[in-house]
Structure formats: structure tokens, C-alpha cells
């Protein structure tokens, strides 16, 4: 995102398969129960990290797809809602390609609640979307759950209890589709809007990521 904002890279989309992490938001990090919540994550085999954007703690694991879209924009604030709407609908369309009854909107009692969550049949959350703005760029981040909703429930029950947050574990869902198929569907939807050119992270970008790593390590 920083390199896109600086004009060093063009608009960039990254689809990644993360390890097991609980991504805490800034307001989680200042909560009284943050320490116990981070310990609960570790006890369940999840690395606690601090996230770039989003409202409350969310989960990444090997059955999820992480999406990061860095967009150059000299005045990013007026476009916040448009980016949310476009990104949420794009994820929903990708899931519908796979036969999922995907809809945009929050589910009552969902974890990390948001108006631009993507759900299945209005009942279970499949994806969450967040944004971060910097000078001359916006970052849209999302996590889409392909499989393994039970792992989300198992770790977030103690994590949210420690943070003093209420939620309904039954709202955690998954698309029930292989990651390869989910990645292909997401790529196909982005290809409808953009000319996609495959690119691998270069050394300058990796070095920048290493410098920022400590900022995202949870206590």
C-alpha cells in the first residue's frame, strides 16, 4: 500500500493463503482483556497479530483466502463507501459462481460485525471487508472462508469472551469449496473489471514488509 501510494507500484491485488492467525483491531488492543484474548488465541494454535483495518478480532487460517487490494487515490476518503460496495459485491459474485447463495450485509450477532460482510442466505458470515487510508492510497482487505468454520468458532469463543464481546457462534460459516476454486472465482471476477498481470513481490516490497513486521505483532 505504501509503495502504491508513493507511485512506485500500480494498483495491486494480492490473493494469499494465510496461516492460522487471529487479527486483532486497534480497539481490541486497548481493551482490558486484550492480553488474555491473545493468550487464548495462542492456546488454540493461532498467532495473534494486529490488523491494518477492520472493526474487531477476525480469524485467518489455512481454509481461508486473504485478499489485499491497494488502490492509488490522491483523495481516498470520498470513495470509502464505493470501495466497500464494489468489493463486497465482487466477493459475493465470486461465491455465487461456486453455487453459494451469497449476499452482501451483516448477520445479527456475527463476529467482527460490518455492514459489508458477505453472508450465505442471510444466516452465516462468509467474508469480512475492511479499509485503511493513507496519503494517496486506499487499502481494501478481506478474508473469505472456504472451509473450517468450526475453527473460527473454537478460537473466537474464548477470544471474544476475554474481550467482553458478545456474538453468536452459529453465525460463523464457510463456503464449503476448495481454495483453488475460490481463488479462481475471485480472480475471474476481478478480471471482469481489471486487466490482471501476474507479479511476484519484489525484494524492495519484501524488505518494507520486514521493517513493518514488528508493528503487527500482538502482545
What are these regions (language model features)?
Residues 1-52, 192:
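N-terminal low-complexity, intrinsically disordered segments
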Amino acid at each position: 500500500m505504501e509503495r502504491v501510494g508513493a507511485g512506485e507500484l500500480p494498483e495491486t491485488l494480492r490473493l494469499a493463503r494465510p496461516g492460522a492467525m487471529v487479527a486483532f483491531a486497534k480497539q481490541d488492543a486497548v481493551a482490558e482483556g486484550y492480553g488474555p484474548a491473545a493468550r487464548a488465541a495462542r492456546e488454540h494454535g493461532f498467532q495473534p497479530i494486529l490488523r491494518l483495518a477492520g472493526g474487531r478480532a477476525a480469524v485467518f487460517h489455512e481454509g481461508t483466502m486473504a485478499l489485499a487490494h491497494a488502490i492509488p487515490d490522491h483523495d481516498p476518503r470520498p470513495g470509502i463507501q464505493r470501495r466497500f460496495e464494489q468489493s463486497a459485491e465482487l466477493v459475493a459474485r465470486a461465491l455465487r459462481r461456486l453455487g453459494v447463495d451469497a449476499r452482501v450485509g451483516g448477520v445479527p450477532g456475527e463476529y467482527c460485525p460490518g455492514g459489508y460482510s458477505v453472508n450465505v442466505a442471510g444466516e452465516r458470515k462468509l467474508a469480512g471487508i475492511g479499509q485503511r487510508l493513507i496519503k494517496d492510497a486506499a487499502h481494501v482487505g478481506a478474508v473469505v472462508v472456504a472451509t473450517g468454520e468450526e475453527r473460527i468458532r473454537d478460537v473466537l469463543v474464548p477470544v471474544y469472551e476475554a474481550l467482553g464481546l458478545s456474538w453468536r457462534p452459529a453465525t460463523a460459516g464457510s463456503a464449503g469449496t476448495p481454495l483453488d476454486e475460490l481463488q479462481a472465482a475471485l480472480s475471474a471476477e476481478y478480471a471482469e473489471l481489471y486487466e490482471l498481470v501476474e507479479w511476484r513481490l519484489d525484494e524492495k516490497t519484501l524488505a518494507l514488509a520486514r521493517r513493518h513486521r514488528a508493528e503487527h505483532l500482538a502482545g
